[in-house]
């Protein structure tokens, strides 16, 4: 069965973005960027893949993307209505309309939809791209966390998981460190 994997960048104090969806405060490095491009090229937006020579690269881990409205909306400013056209894209939103054949807008119960997607035959998993509200809604279905932890305190912003109090156990399975002080850590549900 496929897994729902929450692959996300986060500050030391648990924020995936600033209060206005800023992510430019994360320290970058060529070492980490090269690692991400090789290991998870499908997590790079389509318009950037073309600029850095990843256009046409095979998806390594994911073939399906779930994205909430708050994470999706910045793509409209680029402008694009299909930020990850190399993946099957599901936009979870009860209010946003997108007229793009590559994006399926889901207004229904996202938990039921995730359960159906998990039962599909595929050697690739499902990427929960964000945001924190959607992660909170889907917490019961998240099988694995891949957290890019950056050595910075944001102070406030968009929480990695938003929702009610729901302690959920995960066990660490791997960790990689980079020259910018960031780490990628893998956690599986206990």
State where each predicted segment sits:
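Enzymes that bind and transform nitrogen-containing heteroaromatic metabolites
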Residues: 1-190
């Amino acid at each position: 069965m496929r897994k729902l994997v929450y692959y996300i960048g986060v500050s030391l104090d648990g924020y995936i973005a600033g209060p206005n969806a800023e992510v430019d405060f994360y320290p970058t490095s060529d070492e980490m960027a090269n690692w991400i491009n090789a290991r998870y090229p499908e997590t790079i937006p389509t318009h950037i893949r073309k600029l850095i020579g990843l256009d046409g690269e095979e998806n390594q881990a994911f073939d399906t993307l779930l994205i909430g409205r708050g994470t999706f909306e910045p793509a409209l400013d680029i402008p694009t209505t299909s930020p990850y056209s190399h993946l099957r894209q599901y936009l979870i939103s009860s209010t946003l309309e997108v007229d793009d054949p590559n994006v399926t807008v889901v207004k229904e119960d996202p938990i039921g939809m995730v359960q159906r997607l998990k039962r599909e035959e595929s050697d690739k998993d499902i990427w929960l791209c964000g945001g924190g509200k959607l992660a909170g809604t889907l917490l019961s279905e998240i099988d694995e966390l891949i957290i890019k932890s950056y050595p910075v305190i944001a102070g406030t912003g968009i929480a990695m998981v938003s929702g009610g109090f729901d302690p959920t156990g995960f066990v660490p399975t791997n960790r990689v460190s980079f020259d910018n002080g960031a780490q990628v850590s893998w956690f599986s549900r206990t």
